[in-house]
Amino acid sequence: MENFYKVGTIVNTQGLQGEVRILPSTDFANERFSKGAVLALFDDKDNYIQDLKVKSGRLQKNFYVVKFEGFYHINDVEKYKGYVVKIAQENQEELNDGEFYYHEIIGSDVYDNDILIGQISEILQPGANDVWVVKRKGKRDLLLPYIPPVVLKVDVAQHRVDVDIMEGLDD
């Protein structure tokens, strides 16, 4: 089976016409949830269910409201709450140098002055820039803003991120 990468989670229904609310987990949400996009639906046990073609999608607050082709009523989609939508690796576009997909960053080791401080476990999108959550042993999670003074180098091939933890970030 080909590789799939998570782009969002269906968190609720929207209205009565078969639309769902999706909490995105991708930098490319506008592309992923636009008309004609094909996504794969996976259940809460990560079993593939079916491919879905986006009929329409729009941003509403922190969610995307998406209608898939073939689903016309709330009863058609209600059972998919908590399910995950993913994109097939073959449908991912090539990125420019210095750009990367979330799945390439999550799990990477994080170093400050060549000292391992933890692993990236999650990427948050609170506003102007992404925030990388670093899991550390014996300490609370570290929240690193993805900005040039903090993130110095990202080596996707080596799963390594070099950072400079500025004063005040690790209090």
Swiss-Prot record:
Residues covered by the PRC barrel domain: 97-169
rRNA processing listed as a keyword: yes
Domain of life: Bacteria
UniProt main location, coarse: cytoplasm
Keywords for the protein's UniProt record, in alphabetical order: Chaperone, Cytoplasm, Ribosome biogenesis, rRNA processing
InterPro entries linked: PRC-brl_dom, PRC_barrel-like_sf, RimM, RimM_N, RimM_N_sf, Transl_B-barrel_sf
GO terms under cellular component: cytoplasm; ribosome
Record GO biological process: ribosomal small subunit biogenesis; rRNA processing
Keyword Cytoplasm belongs to the record: yes
GO MF entries: ribosome binding
Cellular compartments annotated: Cytoplasm
Subunit (UniProt): Binds ribosomal protein uS19.
Known function: An accessory protein needed during the final step in the assembly of 30S ribosomal subunit, possibly for assembly of the head region. Essential for efficient processing of 16S rRNA. May be needed both before and after RbfA during the maturation of 16S rRNA. It has affinity for free ribosomal 30S subunits but not for 70S ribosomes.
Database matches in PANTHER family: RIBOSOME MATURATION FACTOR RIMM (PTHR33692:SF1)
Protein family according to the UniProt entry: Belongs to the RimM family.
Domain notes: The PRC barrel domain binds ribosomal protein uS19.
Stated name of the protein: Ribosome maturation factor RimM
